[in-house]
Regions:
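Acidic, low-complexity intrinsically disordered regions
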Residues: 1-161
Length: 161
């Protein structure tokens, strides 16, 4: 749907506007009404250069509200940061975000809360002590963790039951 493009700044608001408009168009088509809802995987440095935090959270909320008869769009944010003083996080719980920097907390707020049907797979991946709700995001995830996010986030619900 979208060709990736990297160039200097991070116009995340503009990118999310385009995503919202594409999803709105796709979800409104009658042939897509009964489809599995869209999944958006945003890979970013987390430092939007064209809006403030509130504007970013608002546009992401609009994206998450795009829906089909089967549910709302799932927005997963993958935050790649130069700040390696914070441990990597995958599907973080709220308490894990207390050690995160401002950008990671903002992206968590922009992300979907993972639907209940995914909780068992996420708990199994995270291990002991993992309790929902989980934010649909990763922070400085390893390639294995990144693939786990994509794998869990893109499974159809029928494969989860």
């Amino acid at each position: 749907w979208v060709e990736p493009h990297a160039e200097g700044t991070t116009p995340m608001y503009e990118a999310m506007l385009r995503v919202r408009d594409m999803l709105s168009d796709w979800c409104s088509r009658s042939e897509n009404r009964e489809s599995f809802p869209p999944i958006v995987i945003n890979i970013t440095d987390g430092e939007s250069s064209d809006c403030d935090d509130r504007e970013l959270c608002d546009i992401c909320s609009q994206i998450r509200r795009q829906s089909t008869a089967d549910g709302n769009t799932l927005l997963l944010n993958i935050h790649i940061s130069a700040n390696n003083t914070i441990p990597s996080m995958v599907f973080p719980m709220a308490e894990e975000l207390t050690v995160a920097d401002h950008y990671a907390r903002t992206l968590a707020e922009c992300s979907s809360i993972m639907p209940d049907v995914f909780n068992s797979a996420i708990c199994q991946m995270k291990g002991a002590g993992a309790t929902p709700p989980f934010f649909g995001m990763g922070y400085n995830a390893s390639i294995i963790e990144l693939l786990s996010i994509i794998n869990i986030g893109s499974r159809s619900v029928s494969n989860m039951q």
